[in-house]
């Protein structure tokens, strides 16, 4: 059993697993998996790791089996878990943007709105939330739990509609389905057990995890640029430079040149560097960022 000065951390199995482990590594924690082992190693003597399904994570955190963990907002709502939501961490297996739970029907079906499904059968893994959604809208439907391959249920005639999660909508369309409504936007959240959150050691450890994870996410898509600029060229260079904050500028020793350092989005670099060079910047260096705190 982990002691009072040990944080019990839950890592989600399945679709979020690889992205989560990669994010932790970028944040400074290396999680080492072993074949068929639910308790991976982590390079922090104050943390123990457990693997569990994202669908179950919030229940384990609420009960205190885990002090904290990462799971989707959708599963916290589905389980109606009473936990502390420490932070939103917007990342997923495909992209760094929220996923959507959508209501979808066959592309050639007559259903256009949720109201059109009154009295119909809906298949989903997110049963509790779906029942609450339709009940709140005053639309009587039959909600059936789906064990997987939910998109195929409509095609096979086993359901009139599905409620399924998607990031891009590509898989939904590939199965001959049409989205008629977005029901929920969801993203990964860092959650904590309420008692653990009141413990000074555990709360501080969770806050450090959050700070570093957020910093790693914030750094994605950003790069640093460093360059030397003649003093007389600085006004033109400054007019061109975007930055998270004002550029850092320092005098070079015994020269009428300045060292300039900025952080920019990676997508603009291929156009920005030639313009900087044309304006007189030299020794331009681009470097990757691991974290932006």
From Swiss-Prot:
Keywords in UniProt for this one?
Amino-acid biosynthesis, ATP-binding, Cytoplasm, Glycosyltransferase, Histidine biosynthesis, Magnesium, Metal-binding, Nucleotide-binding, Transferase
Origin species: Solidesulfovibrio magneticus (strain ATCC 700980 / DSM 13731 / RS-1) (Desulfovibrio magneticus)
Q: What is this protein called?
A: ATP phosphoribosyltransferase
Into which family does the record put it? Belongs to the ATP phosphoribosyltransferase family. Long subfamily.
User: Carries keyword Cytoplasm?
Assistant: yes
> What domain of life is recorded for the organism?
Bacteria
Q: Which reaction does it catalyse?
A: 1-(5-phospho-beta-D-ribosyl)-ATP + diphosphate = 5-phospho-alpha-D-ribose 1-diphosphate + ATP
Q: Name one GO biological process term.
A: L-histidine biosynthetic process
Q: Which GO terms describe its cellular component?
A: cytoplasm
InterPro entries cross-referenced by the UniProt entry? ATP-PRT_HisG_long, ATP_PRibTrfase_cat, ATP_PRibTrfase_CS, ATP_PRibTrfase_HisG, HisG_C, N-reg_PII-like_a/b, N-reg_PII/ATP_PRibTrfase_C
Name the EC number(s): 2.4.2.17
Q: What does this protein do?
A: Catalyzes the condensation of ATP and 5-phosphoribose 1-diphosphate to form N'-(5'-phosphoribosyl)-ATP (PR-ATP). Has a crucial role in the pathway because the rate of histidine biosynthesis seems to be controlled primarily by regulation of HisG enzymatic activity.
| GO MF, any single term | ATP phosphoribosyltransferase activity
What SUPFAM superfamilies does the record point to?
A: GlnB-like, Periplasmic binding protein-like II
């Amino acid at each position: 059993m982990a002691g009072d000065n040990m944080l019990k951390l839950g890592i989600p199995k399945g679709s979020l697993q690889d992205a989560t482990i990669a994010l932790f590594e970028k944040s400074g924690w290396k999680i080492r998996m072993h074949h068929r082992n639910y308790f991976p190693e982590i390079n922090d003597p104050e943390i123990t790791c457990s693997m569990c399904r994202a669908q179950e994570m919030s229940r384990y955190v609420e009960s205190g089996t885990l002090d904290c963990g990462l799971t989707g907002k959708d599963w916290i709502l589905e389980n109606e878990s009473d936990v502390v939501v420490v932070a939103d961490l917007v990342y997923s297996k495909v992209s760094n943007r929220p996923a959507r739970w959508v209501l979808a029907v066959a592309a050639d079906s007559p259903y256009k709105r949720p109201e059109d499904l009154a009295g119909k059968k809906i298949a989903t893994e997110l049963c509790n939330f779906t029942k609450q959604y339709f009940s709140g809208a005053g639309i009587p439907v039959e909600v059936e739990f789906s064990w997987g391959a939910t998109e195929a249920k409509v095609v096979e005639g086993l359901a009139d509609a599905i409620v399924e999660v998607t990031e891009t909508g590509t898989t939904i369309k590939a199965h001959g389905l049409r989205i008629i409504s977005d029901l929920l936007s969801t993203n990964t959240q860092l959650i904590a057990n309420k008692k653990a959150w009141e413990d000074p050691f555990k709360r501080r450890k969770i806050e450090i995890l959050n700070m570093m994870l957020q910093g790693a996410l914030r750094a994605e898509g950003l790069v640093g640029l460093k360059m030397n600029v003649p003093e007389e060229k600085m006004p033109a260079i400054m007019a061109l430079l975007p930055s998270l904050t004002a550029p850092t500028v320092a005098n070079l020793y015994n020269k009428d040149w300045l060292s300039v350092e900025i952080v920019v989005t990676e997508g603009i670099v291929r156009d920005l560097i030639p313009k900087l060079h044309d304006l007189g910047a030299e020794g331009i260096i681009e470097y990757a960022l691991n974290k932006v705190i």
